[in-house]
């Protein structure tokens, strides 16, 4: 409140009441960073409709399915049941540029071009448009989904011509198509009519009454791997996580206090490798076996697990790493209540940087424990370096080597 228009309130909670509350607070502050009349349009999914479609396919109410640019068999918590249900549909067709879990269970697969071979247009936020144009000709005998729709609807236009006609009639208002195509973007200056929330009707009691679980699982996407669409790219697999410095894997991050309580640990081997315990995590009746990284600074009572791993379709065997965290993504909520128990097995990590003793570094840094420091002679924990003279070892402080 003191910050006034310079203030901004944000929330990462997947809850409608929390989002409405933040919306109301920023409106009340008249925050300069809050622009409700030009919202970002990058995420327009409807969870209720997606859940309804998934349940309809599994129950048999829906008889046919066409997918484009999505892989629900991999990216939903009911993916395994959904995959079996898709096999039993009367008709299923997957438009995709690469084989994935959904396509593997579909009756028909239609090859689509890569996005660098395709035309497209986007509205990133209200009134701000962009054009995508191919950088190369199609390498294979593929066809864009939009061109297929145009043919099925009886249109003789190509998708490029359809985009051009739509922009000229509804967006450009007489401006030059060639100029916009050259620039790649266009801002119309229009904005949405934003209705100020009724603060008196926002019921915040669910937030106040919400109880915190004993252990919360935070599902997240890694900087390099994302949701796993590019898991067949070895450069992204090799890219180490900026925090844990681990590559080629996902894992359960946990605080030191919780790790000690659960009997989980990380160990360093003599050659500088990092090993870790396995844990069994259970949420909503589903269990996964996951290796553990003890992460300094993590909040007690929370564990983290990244999306994007565990893919088995469309990848070479040596790149089929990690486990699929989407199986715990119940109702598309990134925070889940979980139970954790330690397993006896140990996992070998590909970690590019450890955060404690580095073996084989010689005398760059002297170190010892407090007990040895207090009970042993100095020569035990901090010996004077020696040099060789006439094949005889002398301390570097000896007059013999001057």
Label each residue range with its predicted role.
Residues 1-58, 169-173, 177:
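Active-site phosphate/pyrophosphate-binding segments
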Residues 18-21, 82, 145-148:
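Stable alpha-helical elements in mature extracytoplasmic
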């Amino acid at each position: 409140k003191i910050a006034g228009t310079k203030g901004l309130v944000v929330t990462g909670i997947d809850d409608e009441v929390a989002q409405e509350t933040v919306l109301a607070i920023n409106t009340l502050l008249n925050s300069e960073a809050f622009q409700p009349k030009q919202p970002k349009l990058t995420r327009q999914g409807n969870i209720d409709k997606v859940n309804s479609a998934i349940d309809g396919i599994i129950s048999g109410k829906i008889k046919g399915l066409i997918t484009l640019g999505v892989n629900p068999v991999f990216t939903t918590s009911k993916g395994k049941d959904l995959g079996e249900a898709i096999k039993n549909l009367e008709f299923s067709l997957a438009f995709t540029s690469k084989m994935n879990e959904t396509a593997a269970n579909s009756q028909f697969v239609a090859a689509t071009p890569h996005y660098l071979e395709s035309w497209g247009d986007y509205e990133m936020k209200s009134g701000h448009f962009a054009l995508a144009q191919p950088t190369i000709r199609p390498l294979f005998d593929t066809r864009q989904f939009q061109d297929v729709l145009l043919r099925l609807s009886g249109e003789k236009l190509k998708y490029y011509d359809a985009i051009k006609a739509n922009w000229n009639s509804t967006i450009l208002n007489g401006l030059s198509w060639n100029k916009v195509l050259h620039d790649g973007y266009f801002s119309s200056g229009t904005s949405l009519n934003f209705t100020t929330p009724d603060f008196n009707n926002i019921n915040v009691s669910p937030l106040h009454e919400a109880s915190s679980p004993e252990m919360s699982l935070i599902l997240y996407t890694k900087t390099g791997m994302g949701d796993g669409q590019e898991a067949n790219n070895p450069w992204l697999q090799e890219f180490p996580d900026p925090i844990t410095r681990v590559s080629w894997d996902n894992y359960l991050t946990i605080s030191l206090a919780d790790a000690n309580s659960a009997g989980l640990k990380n160990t360093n081997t003599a050659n500088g490798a990092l090993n870790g315990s396995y844990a069994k995590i259970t949420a909503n009746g589903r269990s996964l076996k996951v290796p553990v990284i003890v992460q300094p600074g993590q909040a007690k009572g929370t564990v983290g697990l990244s999306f994007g791993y565990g893919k088995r379709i469309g990848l070479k065997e040596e790149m089929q790493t990690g486990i699929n965290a989407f199986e715990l993504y119940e109702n598309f909520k990134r925070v889940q209540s979980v139970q954790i128990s330690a397993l006896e097995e140990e996992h070998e990590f590909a970690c590019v940087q450890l955060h404690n003793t580095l073996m084989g570094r010689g005398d760059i840094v002297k170190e010892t424990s407090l007990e040895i420091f207090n009970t042993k002679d100095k020569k035990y924990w901090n010996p004077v370096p020696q040099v060789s003279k006439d094949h005889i070892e002398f301390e570097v402080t000896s007059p013999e080597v001057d």
